[in-house]
Amino acid sequence: MKRSKNLRAADAKVDRERNYAPLEAVRLAKETSSTKFDGTVEVAFALGVDPRKADQMVRGTVNLPHGTGKTARVLVFATGDRAAAAEAAGADIVGADELIDEVAKGRLDFDAVVATPDLMGKVGRLGRVLGPRGLMPNPKTGTVTPDVVKAVNDIKGGKIEFRVDKHSNLHFIIGKVSFDETKLVENYAAALEEILRLKPSAAKGRYIKKATLATTMGPGIPLDANRTRNLLVEEDPASV
């Protein structure tokens, strides 16, 4: 009951008739977060693309300048020297054939997966397990690579992966509620820049149709996705 009351009170602080500048949205999100734990701050975009068409798929990665606030558990499929290098770089789980079998049976105690190219023939059969969770290694996201050290370091350092879903929505995290507001906005700016860079040439009309920022269990805050400059400014003087 208390949680419901808190949620209603938080929701009442959000003006649904406007789109907030990123800095304002972050401040409001922090203010309306009511969880006892350090919640995650997430952004959702509704994109003007048709993901059923290969030339309108939006998928990529970005290294958030201030990380995500969470140390990802990384699984690496590798053998020999590359397996040893992955372990030395801080990979949490490393293996090959036996590990592939474990994952096929449902082992999912990890947040990211990296594989060397020579093992992808075997890892490929895990598509039904890893695919729906967005964990399938892919050369385009740097997770199928002989350089497992770089891949592990990138992921541990705050690299996030994003992919438009079948409903044309794209979600990504920008940090924790405890983050300084400037760091959250700078993380958002880095992700936004990369997503804009990846706009498919085949996509027509408005690219980002709707944007929302929210914390774990917090209200969704309408975000002005057209704001691509001066993100650390509350509002454009001309629009006040």
UniProtKB/Swiss-Prot annotation:
One of its GO terms (cellular component) is large ribosomal subunit. One of its GO terms (biological process) is translation. The keyword tRNA-binding applies. Pfam families: Ribosomal_L1. Keywords: Repressor, Ribonucleoprotein, Ribosomal protein, RNA-binding, rRNA-binding, Translation regulation, tRNA-binding. Coiled coil: none annotated. InterPro entries: Ribosom_uL1_bac-type, Ribosomal_uL1, Ribosomal_uL1-like, Ribosomal_uL1/biogenesis, Ribosomal_uL1_3-a/b-sand, Ribosomal_uL1_CS. GO terms for molecular function: rRNA binding; structural constituent of ribosome; tRNA binding. Belongs to the universal ribosomal protein uL1 family. NCBIfam families: rplA_bact (TIGR01169). Part of the 50S ribosomal subunit. Binds directly to 23S rRNA. The L1 stalk is quite mobile in the ribosome, and is involved in E site tRNA release. Protein L1 is also a translational repressor protein, it controls the translation of the L11 operon by binding to its mRNA. This is Large ribosomal subunit protein uL1. It comes from Streptomyces griseus subsp. griseus (strain JCM 4626 / CBS 651.72 / NBRC 13350 / KCC S-0626 / ISP 5235).
